[in-house]
Design a protein with these regions (language model features):
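The catalytic "switch" region of P-loop NTPases
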Residues: 2, 7-9, 18-23, 30-106
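Walker B catalytic acidic pair
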Residues: 14-16
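Short, solvent-exposed segments of well-ordered alpha helices
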Residues: 25-28, 113
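Amphipathic alpha-helical segments in well-structured domains
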Residues: 27-34, 144-148
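C-terminal alpha-helical "lid" subdomain
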Residues: 77-183
Length: 183
């Protein structure tokens, strides 16, 4: 009733993978609550989480059936062959530098290598690189251009915490990747 009174069109539950850490009956109780909610609320309920959520949501058929509702989608990292060039080309339009740098094959390859197709990582890499060249121009009079060397430097300096995960993806090390269930 509260959802209808306030004209809620959709309920989004984000970070559902954190249920994996729930102790005791807390996890089961919350999953049962979500199933009941989906059955009674009368509006779409969207559950969002990393791949770590799959273990939780597919624990038994009832939860898997409810979690998939009208369908489920797993959004994985982009492969170099499938959608990467399209995505980066569209992102590349959002250059805020004074000098527009053309997108080259070398830059495309570098961005993929440093992000391994993870959209969040490549966006942050693109943003941080632009911030750096804009600051360097103001401080040292350098041109505001982007290149592969800059992107590699930015990744090395700013992505130290995620470098083990990125390196595991680069190597195709399945055992290491499994340890990081939220990639």
């Amino acid at each position: 009733q509260v959802a209808r009174i306030h004209a809620v069109g959709v309920l989004v539950v984000d970070e559902i993978q954190h249920l994996n850490r729930a102790r005791g009956t807390g996890k089961e109780d919350l999953l049962n609550f979500l199933v009941t909610l989906v059955n009674t609320i009368g509006i779409p309920v969207i559950l969002i989480g990393t791949l770590g959520a799959v273990r939780t949501l597919t624990g038994d058929f009832r939860q898997a059936r409810r979690a998939s509702g009208l369908g489920s989608m797993v959004w994985e990292r982009l492969s170099r062959a499938d959608g990467w060039d399209y995505f980066v080309t569209r992102m590349w339009r959002y250059q805020w530098t004074q000098e527009h740098t053309p997108l080259t094959e070398e830059i495309l390859e570098c961005l993929y290598d440093e992000s391994q197709g993870i959209i969040d990582v490549v966006i942050k890499l693109f943003m941080l690189a632009q911030m750096q060249v804009i600051q360097l121009r103001r401080g040292r009079g350098r041109p505001e251009t982007l290149d592969a060397k800059l992107f590699r430097h930015i990744a090395k300096e700013n992505f130290k915490l995620i470098s083990p995960m990125i390196n595991a993806l680069k190597r195709g090390d399945r055992e290491a990747i499994i340890k990081y269930d939220d990639i």
